[in-house]
Amino acid sequence: MQHPKKVVLAYSGGVDTSVCIPYLKNEYGISEVITFVADLGQGDDIESISQKALNSGATKSVIGNLVEDFVEKYAFPAIRANALYGEKYPLSTALARPLIAENLVKLARKLNAGAVAHGCTGKGNDQVRFDLAINALGPDLEIITPAREWKMSREEAILYGEKFGIPAPVSKKSPYSIDVNLLGRSVEAGFLEDPMQEPNEEVFAMTSSIDDSPNYPKDIEITFKNGFPIAIGNESLSPLKIIQKVNYLAGKNGFGRIDMIEDRVVGIKSREIYEAPGLLLLIKAHKELESITLNPDVLDFKNLVEKKWAQLVYQGFWFGPLKKALDGFIDATQTSVNGKVKIRLHKGNAIIIGRSSENNSLYREDLATYSKDDIFDHKQAEGFIYMWGMSNKIWAELNSKMNN
């Protein structure tokens, strides 16, 4: 098969994507390999990673500062959607993939490349997310996936790279597979593959252990406007600053760890450890504010939408038509999600201790109270109950006659 002479490769600096560079040139006959390094707030030395790509044989290396887009266009919509895959995982890794894919396609267009490539294996979720996003945004582009096609073990891949001047990792190989960005960390493999093995503290980096977290609780107040978090306490902050601050506060107090059995897109179950302190806290606060500002029927239906939205994003359909339609529903619900939520952080817990909405609260104290200020008309309850239970009463009468 004849491949384009120029390809844009999603590059992380790891063994697989480094080996992809000479592999694409020598096994696929590609002349120019341009690497794209995404800065998602992972804390790495991005310039060094970019230089490593050049040292590994890349024709050119491009750095994309995607942190603000990551927060505003991906994390914040997930907060409004209360997105938790499997009712636990806030999609911290999954949200990054369509953003990287989008920028891969943009760079390929800009440089007139006929193909894009990534280093995902055939066993994980990311291959699905990348391929579906690229097909949606650049259906004419070829997608090349060397790590899915070569039959090399990790050790063999390292030896292959050494032939082309790519040094082997100098440190002892970590037993874990780790992915990090601003929103969180995912950790798998090693002894964690035994679902009964408790993770030790070396697995975690964004959150304190219960023993090491402060002995005294920390209360914080989060303000939302149209479903978006806009302030912590009395301080209005940019979206990026909000994520950074709640990451610190929640993580310091031991909140934000997830240990779960996850159903992967490819059909297998895997044991995953996640840290996502800020994202989890903001989703928790946002959902609480919705409880006071949205009607019961809207809340019930939104619960269904949220589950499907999270599934679609996890499964790679960020740019799909159903996800777009669900976005429209979520947008329509958020115009009244304005107010404040108070949370107490302590020893791994995030406890809601208050919520308010000055202009959009559906909570009426004069209707809910049992004091003398109660204005609820109790006499209306009898007629309501009669109508509400009519169908059950008819059914019971009919069955009583049949049984006799």
Curated annotation (Swiss-Prot):
ATP binds at residues 10-18, 38, 119. GO terms for biological process: argininosuccinate metabolic process; L-arginine biosynthetic process; urea cycle. It is an enzyme of class 6 (ligase). It is found in: Cytoplasm. It catalyses: L-citrulline + L-aspartate + ATP = 2-(N(omega)-L-arginino)succinate + AMP + diphosphate + H(+). L-citrulline binds at residues 89, 125, 129, 177, 186, 262, 274. GO terms for cellular component: cytoplasm. Its EC number is 6.3.4.5. Homotetramer. This is Argininosuccinate synthase. The lineage of its organism: Bacteria, Bacillati, Cyanobacteriota, Cyanophyceae, Synechococcales.
